[in-house]
A protein has these predicted regions:
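ABC ATPase "signature
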Residues: 225-226, 234
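Conserved ABC ATPase "signature" region
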Residues: 70-71, 107, 111, 118-135
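Short coil-to-helix segment of the ABC ATPase nucleotide-binding domain corresponding to the Q-loop/switch region
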Residues: 100-107
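ABC ATPase NBD coupling module
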Residues: 18-19, 72-88, 117, 231-235
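Helix-to-loop junction immediately C-terminal to a conserved catalytic motif
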Residues: 55
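Conserved signature/switch motifs of ABC ATPase nucleotide-binding domains
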Residues: 139-142, 160
């Protein structure tokens, strides 16, 4: 796989009144060509600062950023402007020109790049069709829904045929149904146009719906990185557990007693009656503390937190049984949910 974005040792701080605020601290990141790469974290983790450093909307303090084989930090202003043509970007707030039509908004980057008007219009109409807004070329932003505005922003970001599209919380202001439609469009763009996409989000559902790889950012550092399925199956950090299991699991009140086990299953296993099988085969009951299912890249995944019996022999029978089923499971330590 070819690396298209390589970040090493990236750090960025801001003056926060009496003390310096560290937004990024020694961040390493690798994105491969063709990825839909997610960066997820809680508010204030440094996500937006990271994505804005990639095209130098923010200037890093330390570290290297290699994009398309170029050291972005070494470029002068003229060279940077040329490099940015290969890096499209969309934002939460759309940033459309309110007094310009959809067609005029999409044409705008090409006007700046001194395209001929006829060529710019042809390209804009192609992209407006791609994002599903044919027939609305003359409409203005005030006449559009939030989802439509984001589609215009996506079309505008693609005008100069970038190899990379950066999405900074691009679905955060949208309702769930509209979010799914925008993510479906991004997946289409990735597949049909070969655009590598980086999605910044605080929503695990966005990662599950669209991404093949993910980094988890916490308190200015990358704490986990890998394929979405692997991170989902084996979260190693507290923040990953919190993001994957969700708030419901985080507030589960555990009763004192037996060991707690996290069970993860996918594909056909997601529909197997695992708890009933445990009871029948091990002659012992478990206490379900939390359970949910979700779909990642078209595959149904499920997970449970269960509490085993106090009786050590019964608990061991269950662990032995689970080992034989091939289901992914791990014993959870106190405080890890």
């Amino acid at each position: 796989m070819k690396e298209i974005i390589t970040v090493r040792g990236l750090s960025k701080s801001f003056n926060g009144g009496e003390k310096k605020v560290t937004a990024l601290n020694g961040v390493d990141l690798t994105v491969y060509e063709g990825d839909i790469f997610g960066v997820i974290g809680l508010s204030g983790a440094g996500k937006s600062t990271l994505v804005r450093c990639l095209n130098r909307l923010e200037e890093p303090d330390e570290g290297s950023i290699i994009i398309n084989g170029q050291d972005i930090r070494s470029l002068n202003e003229k060279e940077l402007n040329v490099a940015r043509r290969n890096i499209g970007m969309i934002f939460q707030q759309f940033n459309l020109l309110s007094q310009a039509s959809i067609l005029e908004n999409v044409c705008f980057p090409m006007e700046i790049a001194h395209w001929k008007k006829a060529d710019a219009k042809k390209r804009a109409l192609e992209l407006i069709e791609l994002v599903g807004l044919s027939g609305r070329e003359s409409a203005y932003p005030s006449q559009l829904s939030g989802g439509m505005k984001q589609r215009v922003a996506i079309a505008r970001a693609l005008t100069l045929s970038p190899k990379i599209l950066l999405c900074d919380e691009a679905t955060s202001a949208l309702d769930p149904a509209t979010t799914r439609s925008i993510l479906a469009l991004l997946k289409k763009i990735n597949k049909e146009l070969g655009v590598t996409i980086v999605i910044i989000t605080h929503q695990m559902s966005v990662i599950e719906e669209a991404c093949n790889r993910v980094s988890i950012l916490d308190k200015s550092r990358i704490v986990e990185c890998g394929d979405v399925e692997d991170v989902f199956h084996h979260p190693k950090s507290d923040i990953a557990r919190q993001l994957i299991l969700g708030e419901g699991a985080g507030h589960t009140e555990f009763t004192p007693g037996g060991k707690r086990v996290r069970i993860v299953f996918d594909g056909k296993d997601a529909f197997e009656p695992i708890i009933a099988d445990i009871v029948l085969n091990c002659k012992a009951a478990v206490n379900i503390l939390f359970a949910d299912t979700r779909t990642i890249d078209g595959v149904v995944y499920g997970q449970m937190l269960v509490q085993l019996p106090d009786d050590e022999d019964a608990a061991q029978r269950i662990l032995t049984y689970l080992s034989g089923t091939g289901v992914h499971f791990s014993e959870e330590e106190d405080g890890n949910v």
